[in-house]
């Protein structure tokens, strides 16, 4: 769990913002949302494979767009 030290004369909202940012970097909220409901292993593999395919397609489309030159 992320821990922050509140500095002298630091407003509460600034400290809270720092804490939220550290939680986001640690990935706590994403982990909680992922574990909120049980996901079967086959569903998890299927979702991960679909995400990998989507990443690859996005990467290839970026590379192809870079190569096309319209003069």
From Swiss-Prot:
GO terms classed as biological process:
translation
Q: Which UniProt keywords apply?
A: Ribonucleoprotein, Ribosomal protein
Gene3D superfamilies xref list:
Ribosomal protein S8
Enumerate the Pfam families for this protein: Ribosomal_S21
What is the superkingdom listed in this entry's lineage?
A: Bacteria
Q: Which GO terms describe its cellular component?
A: ribonucleoprotein complex; ribosome
The family database entries (NCBIfam families) matched by this protein are listed as: S21p
Similarity field? Belongs to the bacterial ribosomal protein bS21 family.
Which PANTHER family does UniProt cross-reference here?
A: MITOCHONDRIAL 28S RIBOSOMAL PROTEIN S21, SMALL RIBOSOMAL SUBUNIT PROTEIN BS21
Protein name, as recorded: Small ribosomal subunit protein bS21
- In its UniProt entry, the species of origin is given as Shewanella sediminis (strain HAW-EB3)
Gene (UniProt): rpsU
């Amino acid at each position: 769990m992320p821990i922050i030290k509140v500095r002298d004369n630091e407003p509460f909202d600034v400290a809270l913002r720092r804490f939220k940012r550290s939680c986001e970097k640690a990935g706590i909220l994403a982990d909680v949302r992922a574990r909120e409901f049980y996901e079967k292993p086959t569903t998890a593999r299927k979702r991960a494979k679909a995400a990998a395919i989507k990443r690859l397609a996005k990467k290839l489309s970026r590379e192809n767009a870079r190569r096309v030159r319209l003069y």
